[in-house]
Amino acid sequence: MHAGLVAQALVKSILHMHIEVQMASEFMYSDPVIDEKTLVIAVSQSGETIDTLEAMKYAKNRGAKCLAIINVKGSSIARESDYVLYTNAGPEIAVASTKAYTTQLAVFYLIVARMAHSRGVFDDAQTQSFVRELQRTPEVMKKVLERRRDIH
């Protein structure tokens, strides 16, 4: 959900497009407008989240295409999706899904960069710069973590 909210802000600010982000558990009950031009992006760390799987099936039954952003290969959501982007975050040890969330954000940033380029919002140089900055994320995170004792 939260990675989707970041994606929504990116899409609105860079692409000036309207998208809706919803909890999978509420999706079917919100009377969404869905047709064959609709793309539903399902986000799940495990690829087995029942609410997400059911929301995807609901959308597909109404003509939507479904893209899954998931961590686990061969999962139910992967099998049900039209398209799959694997985050390859590895297993989550902590309750907070930090690795999966970070990789989901990276995938959304790359999707937006590609869309911006294909729609002429970004030229080649802007797209490359956008992706380069994203690639710097681990380096920047390392520097921040090295200063963790200085941060209050």
At which residue positions do the language-model features occur?
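Short loop/helix-cap segments at secondary-structure boundaries that form the rim of catalytic
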Residues: 75-80
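Glycine- and acidic
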Residues: 37-42, 49-53, 92-97
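Anionic-ligand anchoring segments at beta-strand to alpha-helix junctions in alpha/beta enzyme folds, i.e.
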Residues: 1-42, 48, 60-74
